[in-house]
Amino acid sequence: MKMLSGSDMVIRSLIDQGIKYIFGYPGGAVLDIYDSLKQMHGIKHILVRHEQSATHMADGYARATGKIGVVLVTSGPGATNSITGIATAYMDSIPLVVISGQVASSLIGYDAFQECDMIGISRPIVKHSFLVKNTEDIPKIFKKAFWLASSGRPGPIVIDLPKDILNPLIKKPYIWPKLISIRSYSPVLQGHQGQIKKALHILIKAKQPIIYIGGGIITSNSHKELKLLAETLNIPVTTSLMALGALPQNHPQNLKMLGMHGTYEANMAIHNADVILAIGVRFDDRTTNNVDKYCPNATIIHIDIDPTSISKTISAHIPIVGHARNVLKQILNLLKNQFSKKNIYNLEHWWKQINCWKSKNSLEYDRKSKKIKPQNVIEIISALTNGNAFVTSDVGQHQMFTALYYSFNKPRRWVNSGGLGTMGYGLPAALGVKLALPKETVLCITGDGSIQMNIQELSTAMQYKLSILILNLNNRSLGMVKQWQDIIYSGRHSHSYMKSLPNFIKLAESYGHIGISIHNPEDLEKKLKLALLKLDQGNLVFVDITIDPEEHVYPMQIRSGGMNEMILRTTEHTSL
């Protein structure tokens, strides 16, 4: 039996869990852990420049790989700096384990130096949290934490470690549990067969069905089963922001993204559907608009592993609790064994209507403009990378342009903060992706507002030689804020302009990277090709692109309207 100190147990537990990377920042309460990390081998630590970035890097790592991201921060400000990243992961169901230092057990509650109640602060935004009270409990708690983070609906876990239990002079028996079970937590993995049969009966008789998929399809690795079901039944598919790439964007049945800035055909199809098969979605406000007007004629079948997500905002007529991949396999097996193609309703008229909506060309824009259009930037970079890059974004117009105009044809290639909408996410997340997948092309598409939130991580990129391509869509403003002010507040621009932007090229160069500026549409493709060439040579390349500051993201749903009520262009509204 091994006798280890608490700090050694932390590192040994991570090694036994198979962890390869930790994203963190040292401080007094965790120096014993950092000393153990120095002396033990098997884990690489990535030193960030801010703890928020540590959580975003771990988040990007987790989204791109499906593995659990690990964060290590000190007590007090180190812990509180990680909160935004934890909330980001929680909203999007991303598995993280965040290890936070804490003051000594005897000092908790006495306002000691760098003390904060990390358990209390993080409680609403974690799947579970642990305050470790005994050194010998460390292996068992770590095993539980990693199982909880990845099982059922994934999410972040916090482990708070008081400094005294890490004491390198006190040795305790180290026992790594082979198995773990928590009696109060047992996710349902298989769908109820009766509910599945009922759902399938309704689905194959539908005249205007649609499959609506969310991030749960990505998390559960269900994209192959989804594609097979959609093709077997010839049903159109629409996606939330989080599900891009689960079904190839160029698939003929993919109506692309729905919701606030979704395509005309996606929003019209779901509004007019008579049956909605929703898989791994939350029905959040960005995808429903006014819930009282939501899809008035639809029977809703909702599949989700989290029973609390079902009927939370939109009531499901047929709820099915289970792991999406398992449930889809159950549906496919039932379809194969009990139904023939002659029983499936002919959807010719439905597809004719959908193709009519598609003819609106809701994503068309001015391609002859003398100013650079952000849509054109995304289309060109998508073509140059064959839609195969891993793409991170921040939040705002650039995020929506990327979602609408980049052709994501594989799952896990789109990495963004969907639920919380976190500015400053894109750069550190891209570094996490690149660390996990060093041979892949990684893009960070951002804006002049968002990039400044965590721009210090250009230093981290240089230290670890992480070569990514940053496309800064620079409109000298907070673009989405300005768009809302244009449309809703009669053009009253209150604090949405950036009047003192840095020289991004010189800033990137000061960190040791390559900077490229683009001002003219005719230079766009040529300079983006150059940027990709420099990227392939192992450089981080920062491309500052001056875009049309007046460009808006369309379509845009009308507030408090139905899914079918949209602004298609500046001069065109529709509720037809």
Curated annotation (Swiss-Prot):
Q: Which parts of the sequence bind Mg(2+)?
A: D448, N475
Is the keyword Thylakoid in the record?
Answer: no
Alphabetically sorted, this entry's keywords are: Amino-acid biosynthesis, Branched-chain amino acid biosynthesis, FAD, Flavoprotein, Magnesium, Metal-binding, Thiamine pyrophosphate, Transferase
Instruction: Report a single Gene Ontology molecular function.
Output: acetolactate synthase activity
Query: Where does this protein act, in terms of pathway?
Result: Amino-acid biosynthesis; L-isoleucine biosynthesis; L-isoleucine from 2-oxobutanoate: step 1/4; Amino-acid biosynthesis; L-valine biosynthesis; L-valine from pyruvate: step 1/4
Cite the binding residues for FAD.
Answer: 153, 261-282, 304-323
PANTHER family tied to this protein:
ACETOLACTATE SYNTHASE CATALYTIC SUBUNIT, MITOCHONDRIAL (PTHR18968:SF13), THIAMINE PYROPHOSPHATE ENZYMES (PTHR18968)
Q: What is this protein called?
A: Acetolactate synthase large subunit
Species lineage: Bacteria, Pseudomonadati, Pseudomonadota, Gammaproteobacteria, Enterobacterales
